[in-house]
Curated annotation (Swiss-Prot):
Keywords: Cytoplasm, Hydrolase, RNA-binding, tRNA-binding. This is Peptidyl-tRNA hydrolase. Belongs to the PTH family. Monomer. Its EC number is 3.1.1.29. It comes from the Bacteria. Hydrolyzes ribosome-free peptidyl-tRNAs (with 1 or more amino acids incorporated), which drop off the ribosome during protein synthesis, or as a result of ribosome stalling. Catalyzes the release of premature peptidyl moieties from peptidyl-tRNA molecules trapped in stalled 50S ribosomal subunits, and thus maintains levels of free tRNAs and 50S ribosomes. The record marks 95 as: Stabilizes the basic form of H active site to accept a proton. The record marks 14 as: Discriminates between blocked and unblocked aminoacyl-tRNA. It is an enzyme of class 3 (hydrolase). The active site is at residue 24. GO terms for molecular function: peptidyl-tRNA hydrolase activity; tRNA binding. One of its GO terms (cellular component) is cytoplasm.
Length: 196
């Protein structure tokens, strides 16, 4: 398992006001909150196909691709190549259907779980070996409803649980920033008491 501190944090989502509050944009929401925590602002960088922020003090880039979910890898690959960031130094934050709202999973590598943003990212990085922070959004119960489900806002109770999960993820950021992945994984993957 990689022990490198992250040099790039990518939040996956879709651009445009109509998608801002959707379940699929959980990764964007994490990146926006992390930027606030680090005191940096995003600016649009066309060469990287997205909104980019450089937290120089933390030694990390933040990226929100503006390519739509299915082409996220175009932005990730462009920034990673330009700054010579290895896949093991990348953390991709995304929504996860197979995890209930309010729960998180931090992991390195592995399968893509049918997530099109991850599929494209892996294609552009030519590997699955990068860190992922999976933000649970729950499953609609019917696979035919998935597209409609992820492109709608969460119900109020679910959104509260997702927001609490984002708060826990931000609280673990100092560990992640130091490359203390095992400690961060233990902390983030634990089921919150309120959901037990």
């Amino acid at each position: 398992m990689s022990a490198a501190a992250p040099r790039l944090v990518v939040g996956l989502g879709n651009p445009g006001a109509e998608y801002t509050e959707t379940r699929h944009n959980a990764g964007f929401r994490f990146c926006e909150r992390l930027a606030d925590k680090l005191g940096v602002r995003f600016s649009h960088e066309s060469r990287f196909h997205g909104f980019v922020a450089n937290a120089r003090d933390a030694g990390v880039w933040l990226l929100m691709p503006q390519t739509y979910m299915n082409r996220s890898g175009q932005a990730v690959g462009a920034l990673a190549r330009f700054y010579r960031i290895a896949p093991a130094e990348i953390l991709v934050v995304h929504d996860e259907l197979d995890i209930p709202p309010g729960q998180l999973r931090l992991k390195f590598g592995g399968g893509l779980g049918g997530h099109n943003g991850l599929k494209d990212t892996s294609a552009h990085l030519a590997t699955n070996d990068y860190w992922r922070l999976r933000i649970g959004i729950g499953h609609p119960g019917d696979r035919n409803e998935v597209v409609n489900y992820v492109l709608k806002p969460a119900r109020r109770e679910e959104q509260g649980q997702i927001d609490e999960a984002l708060d826990r993820a931000l609280a673990a950021w100092p560990m992640i920033a130091r490359g203390e992945w095992n400690a961060a994984t233990t902390r983030l993957n634990a089921r919150p008491a309120a959901l037990k």
